[in-house]
From Swiss-Prot:
InterPro entries: AA9, AA9_LPMO
Glycoprotein as UniProt keyword: yes
This protein's encoding gene: AA9E
Keywords for the protein's UniProt record, in alphabetical order: Carbohydrate metabolism, Cellulose degradation, Copper, Disulfide bond, Glycoprotein, Metal-binding, Monooxygenase, Oxidoreductase, Polysaccharide degradation, Secreted, Signal
Family: Belongs to the polysaccharide monooxygenase AA9 family.
Taxonomic source organism: Botryotinia fuckeliana (strain B05.10)
Name this protein carries in UniProt: AA9 family lytic polysaccharide monooxygenase E
Amino acid sequence: MRSSDITFVLLSVVATVRSHATFQELWINSVDQVGSCVRLPPTNSPITDLTSTDLRCNVGGTVGVSGVCSVAAGGNVTVEMHQQPGDRSCANEAIGGAHYGPVILYMSKVSNAATDTGSGSWFKVDQEGYDQTLNANCGKRSFTIPSTLAPGDYLLRAEVIALHVAGSVGGAQLYMSCFQLRVTGSGSKNPTGVLFPGAYSATDPGILINIYQTINNYTIPGPTTVFTG
């Protein structure tokens, strides 16, 4: 076995036994929504089956919660991830164990954010590639609700794809949560997007990748278009 292969195996084993994480909090224009509109997954474990409906909003995520968070088009939204439920300490890594990978945010227009199952079309509103931004920012990732987006109910899907054991098919670990939003404003745009499952393939270059080698260019999974209004 080559030394590079041995290094990959050892690092993969170490990373595998380290931390998982959950997107659990939402901020709107710097105001903490205190978990009022998140479909919180039952555990901090990842989804690895890219053909599962759990890919939409995580395990149990087809069932909504009562709260819906209101935000005006053009407003600022921040999602927040941590390793353990209720632990928001910035002293702890948001997602540990060398869980490097992209952060991707999707939205889906729905008739009722509290009851929709997430089976509709999802469009990208923000993405960032292979780095450790979440850990550097206390688990937070911010984006702007597109100013031209039509008003109504939406699901917001926040996702990290951890690539520490993604060198073989089925190794990528996906962590996602859905938030229930009500967008206000006078916009008229209704972007189309992709379905979950279906948006990702197990052999996509951003899904099947050995991160313990030199990476010159990383291809973020999903559609190339990011709707910013």
